[in-house]
Curated annotation (Swiss-Prot):
Flavoprotein in keyword set: no
Chain intervals for the UniProt region annotation (Disordered): 494-615, 638-756
Regions of compositional bias (Basic and acidic residues) in chain numbering: 605-615, 677-691, 736-749
Source lineage: Eukaryota, Amoebozoa, Evosea, Eumycetozoa, Dictyostelia
Keyword terms: Coiled coil, Nucleus, Protein transport, Ribosome biogenesis, Transport
Acidic residues bias: start-end ranges: 494-514, 521-596, 647-656
Pfam families tied to this protein: SDA1_C, SDA1_dom, SDA1_HEAT
Stated name of the protein: Protein SDA1 homolog
Coiled coil segments of this chain: 227-282
Compositionally biased intervals (Basic residues): 725-735
Length: 756
């Protein structure tokens, strides 16, 4: 070539365009790199700028010359592995980026590179660790994008599990973060990964312990979700709000074609958003269910909790994790409840959180004798007249949560005392006490005093400890057969009003009464409006009247015969015998009819049972049908309690106990007054709306991200010569002296008004 190329970036560009034409230049740079590498291996120095440029150039053009650069990836990986602690941080990152570039072009084996990157986690270089972490997660995700590569995953998992027990705490923590991220992205979503992560709670490093606890406690709602997940959540919320607005407008306003179209479109958008969310959360089970030997694991973790010297915030996280294990796997850790009892004081830090942990650890297999002291302690310290209203409300709500899971934990005397708080003036206390009363009134009214049990309340039966209620078939299966309830649910989901058959029947009955009242005027005129159905009904009525007339004639004949029988005693005795025989025959006929009716009722009931059993045994219910049964049950409860279906559904979703049986501390607080703000908080809130409210427009104008308007450019930046012919300038120059005086006076008057 005639010209000498000095810039490596320019040479890189030209080499990619025509590799054969620039092969001599490439070989020259490659020889230069080899000499620099030998010098660098003997004595790594700070003068690495030229060497890093050569490495970057060769990593970009290695695709063009695969034979000549076959040893280049191994040389860079060996240099990083042997001299990682002696290299400069910037050079380490350049070498790592070059390896990533070659791995993306399939010039480096994946297992070899990932094993090297995991070893580089030991280096005290935070930017390098973040670079390696992001690449490892992305590389494994792309490998398993189309289908699971089980062989590769097994090899990487085994290597990563050994890194969990590495001497370097930084490497162990980064390996743990990689596994958590891969599990959260549904890439390594298996029991092996979960059980390796679960061993992090026994680590002596506090950071590893807290990371593991956060994983198990917030697996369904991570602390820092991805931007894509946030966008999808916002999109689903926006679609749900839009559907509610359109359905309300359609239900309340006039039924126009445009509103119907907009409602249908909003329904389609909401369905798409829900499908995206369901596809994203396809494996929809928490990691806590995949732990091996949960009883032994929980006992071991409780021993760690008793002996630990961690901060109190970390200890209550361990308590929360143990309580979730106890509830999910129905464990018996009886030492855990007396351990919690010593924290049950109103002045205890994070007491609401601890009460939620206690209520969450209760289930039907826990011995009530273990929970009764806890309930008595809560009633003693939280539910008394000396405590504040917020404390009493929290105590009552906690007792209700415990009793909803283990109703035998409270005795009737204490229950009778607690329900008396419903007469208090404080709203939170009254609502909490009424909630406790309503729970026992709906489920176990026999535990309440007689005057509080209510009417038509059936006791579902308070089972003894260790007994379970065995259900036959699927609960609520009969609701799928209820046509009216299904039609009402379809109408609600479509955003339309539903008119029940009862209303139509009542309307028809009312119309019938009106017709009877109006027929007293003119029978002839009204007879013209009689329909064919009315004619048929009239014919049936005439037949019934004829039969009744015949019965009356027979009764009159019998009465005449009886009157004639009084004339002779012999005839009377004979007829009396006949009457007795007639009465006996009638009684026998009635008994036979009743016996015929009873078997038919039994047969119909047996048929209904057989039909239910057949649908349970033969037909496999789909997920959609199970979801519909749940919706129908909610709608039925809403109709019985005179509530709106939307409110019942929303309450069911917002209730913390319905999400994997968890209890949130906010659920125990109930209705409470808003806390009064302090002075500094009020000042800060008042200043929020004042930012940029004062000063000139130029100072308040956003300097970044916005361009100036043409009007502003014409006013400030335009040369005056170009504005001589404008209307504004010519108007000023052509003004008379009188007009100028008037304008000056108005200007001075405006200034004076502005001063005062």
């Amino acid at each position: 070539m005639g010209t000498r190329i000095l810039d490596l970036l320019q040479l890189q560009n030209l080499t990619k365009r025509d590799p054969s034409a620039y092969k001599e230049e490439f070989l020259l740079q490659y020889q230069h790199y080899l000499t620099q590498l030998q010098i660098f291996q003997l004595k790594p120095t700070k003068e690495f700028k030229h060497f890093s440029q050569l490495v970057s150039y060769l990593s970009h053009v290695c695709v063009c010359y695969p034979k000549e650069l076959s040893e280049f990836p191994k040389q860079i990986s060996d240099l990083l592995e042997n001299n990682c602690n002696n290299l400069e941080p910037e050079l380490r990152r350049i070498l790592a980026k070059s390896l990533i570039l070659m791995r993306n072009r399939n010039l480096l084996p994946q297992i070899q590179m990932l094993s090297l990157f995991f070893k580089l986690f030991r280096v005290h270089d935070k930017p390098l660790r973040s670079l390696l972490y992001s690449h490892i997660v992305a590389d494994i995700k792309n490998t398993n994008l189309k289908q699971k590569n089980q062989k590769l995953n097994r090899t990487l998992q085994n290597f990563m599990f050994t890194m969990m027990n590495d001497d370097s705490e930084i490497a162990s923590k980064m390996s743990l973060k990689v596994m958590i991220e891969l599990f959260r992205k549904k890439i390594w979503h298996d029991t092996k990964t979960v059980n390796v992560i679960s061993n992090g709670v026994f680590s002596k490093n506090s950071k590893i312990l807290i990371t593991t606890l956060n994983f198990f406690l917030h697996i369904d709602n991570p602390d820092k979700p991805d931007e894509e997940e946030e966008d999808e959540a916002v999109k689903e919320k926006r679609a749900k709000d839009n559907f509610r607005k359109k359905s309300l407008a359609h239900r309340v306003g006039k039924k126009t074609k445009g509103r119907i179209t907009r409602l249908a479109k909003s329904k389609v958008d909401l369905k798409k958003a829900k499908q995206e969310e369901d596809n994203k959360l396809q494996p929809n089970f928490p990691a806590i269910e995949l732990i091996h030997d949960p009883q032994g694991y929980c006992d071991k973790l409780f021993n760690v909790l008793v002996k630990t010297t961690e901060k109190f915030e970390t200890r209550i996280m361990i308590m929360n994790f143990i309580s979730r294990l106890i509830y999910v796997h129905k464990l018996m850790v009886y030492n855990f409840y007396p351990f919690l009892q010593k924290y049950l004081q109103p002045h205890q830090k994070n007491i609401t959180y601890l009460l939620a942990v206690l209520a969450q650890s209760c289930h039907e297999l826990v011995d009530p004798d273990v929970l009764k002291p806890l309930v008595m302690t809560i009633a003693k310290y939280f539910v008394n007249d000396g405590c504040g209203s917020d404390v009493i409300a929290i105590g009552l709500n906690t007792i209700r949560s415990i009793c909803s899971r283990c109703p035998l934990a409270i005795d009737t005397v204490l229950l009778a005392d607690l329900i008396q708080y419903r007469e208090k003036k404080e709203k939170g206390v009254a609502m909490a006490s009424k909630s406790l009363l309503q729970f026992f009134k709906d489920n176990y009214p026999s535990m309440l005093p007689k005057k509080e049990r209510g009417k038509n309340k059936t006791d579902i039966g308070l089972l003894a400890f260790g007994h379970q209620k065995v259900s036959q078939g699927i609960d609520g299966l009969d609701l799928l057969m209820d046509e009216e309830l299904n039609a009402r649910l379809d109408a609600i989901e479509a955003g339309e009003e539903f008119e029940s058959d009862d209303d139509s029947d009542s309307d028809s009955d009312d119309e019938g009464w009106e017709d009877v009242n109006t027929t007293t005027a003119d029978d002839d005129n009204n007879s013209e409006w009689v329909s064919d159905d009315d004619d048929e009904e009239g014919e049936e009525d005439e037949e019934v009247e004829d039969e009744e007339d015949e019965e009356e004639v027979d009764e009159e004949e019998l009465e005449d015969d009886e009157e004639g029988d009084w004339e002779s005693g012999e005839e009377i005795e004979g007829d009396d015998d006949d009457d007795e025989e007639w009465e006996e025959v009638e009684e026998e006929v009635e008994e036979e009819e009743e016996e015929e009716i009873k078997p038919t009722k039994k047969k119909s009931q047996q048929k209904e049972k057989v039909e239910v059993l057949r649908t349970d045994d033969i037909k496999v219910l789909t997920d959609e049908e199970l979801i519909r049964i749940r919706k129908l049950r909610i709608l039925k409860e809403a109709r019985e309690n005179n509530k709106q279906y939307e409110d019942m559904d929303q309450d069911d979703d917002e209730n913390g106990e319905n999400v994997h049986g968890l209890i949130r501390p906010e659920d125990l607080q109930g209705a409470h007054k808003k806390k009064k703000e302090e002075k500094l908080e009020r000042i800060a809130r008042a200043k929020e709306g004042r930012d940029g409210g004062y000063g000139s427009k130029a100072s308040r104008r956003d300097k970044t991200g916005k361009s100036t308007t043409n009007e502003y450019k014409a006013k400030v930046t335009k040369p005056f010569v170009l504005t001589l012919k404008t209307k504004k300038v010519r108007g000023k120059s052509l003004k008379s002296f009188r007009d100028k005086q008037i304008g000056q006076r108005e200007h001075s008057a405006r200034q004076k008004r502005g001063r005062h």
